[in-house]
Amino acid sequence: MVDYQGKKVVIIGLGLTGLSCVDFFIARGVTPRVMDTRINPPGLDQLPESVEQHVGDLNQEWLLDADLIVVSPGMALAHPALSEAAEAGVEIIGDIELFCRENQAPVVAITGSNGKSTVTTLVGEMAKAAGWSVGGGGNIGVPALTLLKQDNQLTVLELSSFQLETTHSLRASAATILNVTEDHTDRYPLGLQQYRAAKLRVYENAKVCVVNADDALTMPVRGADSRCISFGVDVGDYHLNKQQGEIWLRVRGEKVLNTREMKLSGRHNYTNALAALALADAVGIPRASSLKALTTFSGLPHRFQLVLERHGVRWINDSKATNVGSTEAALDGLQVDGTLHLLLGGDGKSADFSGLTHFLQGDRIKVYCFGRDGGQLAALRPDVSQLTETMAQAMALVAKVVLPGDRVLLSPACASLDQFRSFEHRGNEFARLAEELG
């Protein structure tokens, strides 16, 4: 526990997380100041009257006068105003650090470029199936500080690289980096290793590290050690096993579940299940409860979600695929009876799309590209690609040629904000248009 009495605290960034920080300090007898670069940030009208606010930009005078700055993950630490405050000796942390200083419950910490939300939710479902009281949140759903108010036996946190940058006191009972693929190049100008270094912070002081045997970038800097348990497709303590056309989850050579019994589909989801099982085992959730959860969990919206099956055509919403690695995961091992109609596009965040080319081969694929970086994506395989301005135009083209046995997959490999409010908005539009056109 840390005593914040008498500290001058500034919170940067409102919304649910910012408000949870305000509540945290007021409950401890400290009235913070709040600022947000947005003119009308969400939650502004919910601030207590006693809290000073500054919107539209950063108030440098407040920052330099502070003892402690709690910064939103959306604000880069490299911002000149924050750099100046840090050089002046002001402590800069995030809400996850505040949580870790106070939390008493065991923590499962999950990060990675792709699959975080699915694995976080799965581990929570496994704990619930065992009758445990569990709180889940962080980068998904409930702000971490809200979880402090609950008396849980286990806390499962999804953590982004941005959140980990400002966290120093995390001591996870089990932690994982699911994978590391290029993302957020705008925030990590030094490249993939800088991004990876932020992710690796999740292993600091962790009792058990769950690593991806197929991705060396998920290993601790000094390599695997006695804390490490691995999962992977063909190798790892937890791995997949194909026998007579069926795929099993195996743990150290023992078959534990036939994937036919799972509602999740796709190889990337089977490895997500392995990671969740490894984490659950590490914190003592009974195996039978975990396996039961795997047979009932049907996945999260916008993550390889079947939204329509009509006239023999399956329409799949994978709008959460906001980077190249996530789309590669969706395409890896994907089997389609007919033709795959793949929708790509949006804001690529300066990413290198060339890795997708490998997955766009063959004559049973058609690619429909839209949005800000649609042209770059269409150039990967111009002979099978069509370029439109919007996703709706692309789907109208798909509807004219789709046949029974085909699959329509929105897995854009890009952020959505060039044309949509969020990846959820994009996914909901895809589902609406599928229903209309399918």
From Swiss-Prot:
GO terms for cellular component: cytoplasm. Its main location: cytoplasm. One of its GO terms (molecular function) is UDP-N-acetylmuramoylalanine-D-glutamate ligase activity. One of its GO terms (biological process) is cell division. InterPro entries: Mur-like_cat_sf (IPR036565), Mur_ligase_C (IPR004101), Mur_ligase_C_dom_sf (IPR036615), Mur_ligase_cen (IPR013221), MurD (IPR005762). Its EC number is 6.3.2.9. It is found in: Cytoplasm. Keywords: ATP-binding, Cell cycle, Cell division, Cell shape, Cell wall biogenesis/degradation, Cytoplasm, Ligase, Nucleotide-binding, Peptidoglycan synthesis. It catalyses: UDP-N-acetyl-alpha-D-muramoyl-L-alanine + D-glutamate + ATP = UDP-N-acetyl-alpha-D-muramoyl-L-alanyl-D-glutamate + ADP + phosphate + H(+). It is an enzyme of class 6 (ligase). Pathway: Cell wall biogenesis; peptidoglycan biosynthesis. Belongs to the MurCDEF family. NCBIfam families: murD. Cell wall formation. Catalyzes the addition of glutamate to the nucleotide precursor UDP-N-acetylmuramoyl-L-alanine (UMA). This is UDP-N-acetylmuramoylalanine--D-glutamate ligase. It comes from Yersinia pestis. The gene is murD.
